[in-house]
């Protein structure tokens, strides 16, 4: 190497920044032969060795620098980076914090601290550290990009999108930033923009596995399943041990109804990352969907580990399936109304076994549950809780009962309904609905308000026109929410009427919904609360369920009946978001239903 007049430490740092790591190490080692106590030079050597992947040597150099100069922030920074790289994340965090105590303006240390906090699961701390870094050095594009990813993890999609956009403005040739922007667009629901951003990332770097995986996610939401699968497979060719990419492949396979392949992908994802809660949960749901109950129920406990999960409402002694007479058991609802209804089907098993059961439930269901289960105590859920844990021997969330009492399809009872509507209201509704002399009264519900999968479960009322023309039927609105505009459009454009009872709030008055369902001869509905209510009442109910995306596991796969609700028939969509064939099948079946009455 030609002579350079600069100090060896400065020359070594410059060579490191240029990526000439071997030369940097050579310069620094030669200089340290003459100045073995130069802590800054040792720290710089640790940095170069770390970037080379020589972690043990880097650790030794950083530790020696700290022994000589405990107040040298860069040495603590390099030690922290090595510790994180060697899997000692918590120690790395401590070292980064020490570096920042010594130099609060050390932007790179704030950035690395953010990454380490993210690895440890402290997303809020990660975001805070990245924000400190970009306040100190606003031009750090990689930190803006990482901040965007952390904000996405925290569910702050708008802020994440802004941070990722700023990253690509600062560094238009930074492929990873474009990939993160693509992911942010995907989470924001802008899938075409997501595809464009990921394609830009891949124009800059075809070897970027994350961009391929993000592209696969966006393509999947556009319905391009084959292209999505190919993108995910390319990501895994580049990074075979990438748990997130393996999980994303599983999602695409599940969407394509390749359930065995999806199970294999989820299993591989959790082998690679044992703490990957979403992969464990999807594995659980696919196993349950296929009837593999023992393993599926056991893995269903991972729902508490998902980031979006609410904390357990009660956490004292858990019930573990003992059917001991007199045992005082507190049951509590943990999910939505439909889930509380479906899992309430298991309560009878507990009562018959002699357990003393108290059920804490959504207030809208409390009266209905008291009438339906007179041998248990029903408490309306409130905050703070209206029950005293000391009054019970154990507790269980409703969805946790299946693990112990529904181990196989044979364990599901062939009941005739377990909920009982208010008889007086049923009689009143029946009188109102039948005075016009129709052969059959059929309740319909066509939409789901679920934020994540509602669009996949929903139809438009206008799509039902052929069904609504079946003669001899009075159709009744069982759809919660404001349906006035949909019904008026149907009347004006198709000349069709759906009877609406304005005095029943189908969202809040679930007693009214139950009575109205009970007053019908048949209920036809998409997967929502109405489906659960009708099935739990034992009414004939025909369910429209999505092909894959939006299909909840408890409708199972390749079945046209329901293990949970014996009175239910299931019409499964064959092509995503195309309900035409299924609604036509319902039209034909309804014609036969009316003819036989």
Regions found by a protein language model. Give the residues of each.
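Alpha-helical solenoid repeat scaffolds of the TPR/TPR-like class and their adjacent stem/linker regions
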Residues: 1-597
